[in-house]
Amino acid sequence: MAASQVLGEKINILSGETVKAGDRDPLGNDCPEQDRLPQRSWRQKCASYVLALRPWSFSASLTPVALGSALAYRSHGVLDPRLLVGCAVAVLAVHGAGNLVNTYYDFSKGIDHKKSDDRTLVDRILEPQDVVRFGVFLYTLGCVCAACLYYLSPLKLEHLALIYFGGLSGSFLYTGGIGFKYVALGDLIILITFGPLAVMFAYAIQVGSLAIFPLVYAIPLALSTEAILHSNNTRDMESDREAGIVTLAILIGPTFSYILYNTLLFLPYLVFSILATHCTISLALPLLTIPMAFSLERQFRSQAFNKLPQRTAKLNLLLGLFYVFGIILAPAGSLPKI
C-alpha cells in the first residue's frame, strides 16, 4: 500500500515516464489502478497463513481437549490416541477458522488499523478473499474430522453433532452473523465454547456418553481462557469505542476491568488449592504457575498491554498442562464425580 503514490498514476520503470491508470505499458499490458502485491514464495505465503491463524491463542483449544481426555482416562480408564488426535485437529480447525472470521469482520467493519495487534488484512499480508477461502477450508477440515470421529467413537451421532456444531456456530457467530463480540456477549461465547463445551466434547468422544462432572472440572480452565480475551479487549478498549462496538471491558471501565482480570487470573488457584486439600495433592501442580500470574497482574496494573494477551495465553497453556498432569497422576477414585 504505497501511500506516497498518487492514486491512478504509475511510474514506468523502463522509460521513466508516468503512465495513467487505464493506459498500456510498452508490453501492451493494462496498468491497474493500484499496485499489485509483490510476488512471494510459497514459504512466505504459508507463513502469512500461519500468522493469520494467531497460533499463540491455540492453548485455549488444546488444553480443554487434553483435560477432557485426561478426565476420560482417569474416570473410565480409556484413552484412544486416534480419538485424541482427531478431536484436537477438529477443535483446532474450528478455532483457527473462528480467528479468521474475526480478522475478516474486524477489517470489513473498520475496526482493525495500523496499530492493531492483528494487521493481516490492514497490511495486505493476505487479501480478504484469501482469508475467506482459508476459513472455509478449515471449517470443512473440522467437519471431516468430526465425521471420522463419528465412525471411531462410541458417542451417539446426535450428541456429537450437538456439541461440535454448537462450538462451530459459536466460533463463527463471535464476529460473523449476529456478531456477539460487538454487543458485549463475546466473553460469554468464549467462556462456554473454549471451556465446558470443548472439555465435554473431548471427554464424550472417548467414553461415548455425556456427563456433568467434566463441565465442573472445566471451570478453572475456562476462567483462565477468558482472561486471554479480557486482556485483549481491555487493550483495545479505546479503538473499539471509536469503532462504535461494545465489549464487556468498555461497559465496566478500566477499574473494574482490572478487578475482573485479577478474578479470572487468581480464582482458578483457589479452586486448585481446595481440590489439592480435599482430593489429591497432585492437583496442586498448577500452583507452580502463580509467579507468572503475579507478573501479569503487575503488567495489567501498569497498563503495559503490549503482548499481554500472548503472555496470558502462555500462562493458560502452562496452567492447563499442569492441571492435566495433576488429573492423570491422581490416585484412582480420588477425584469426585460431581
Swiss-Prot record:
It is found in: Endoplasmic reticulum membrane; Golgi apparatus membrane; Mitochondrion membrane; Cytoplasm. Changing D112N: In SCCD; reduced menaquinone-4 (MK-4) synthesis. One of its GO terms (biological process) is menaquinone biosynthetic process. The modification N-acetylalanine is found at A2. One of its GO terms (cellular component) is endoplasmic reticulum membrane. The chain crosses the membrane at residues 83-103, 134-154, 160-180, 188-208, 209-229, 245-267, 277-297, 315-335. It is a multi-pass membrane protein. It comes from the Eukaryota. Belongs to the UbiA prenyltransferase family. This is UbiA prenyltransferase domain-containing protein 1. It comes from Homo sapiens (Human). The lineage of its organism: Eukaryota, Metazoa, Chordata, Craniata, Vertebrata.
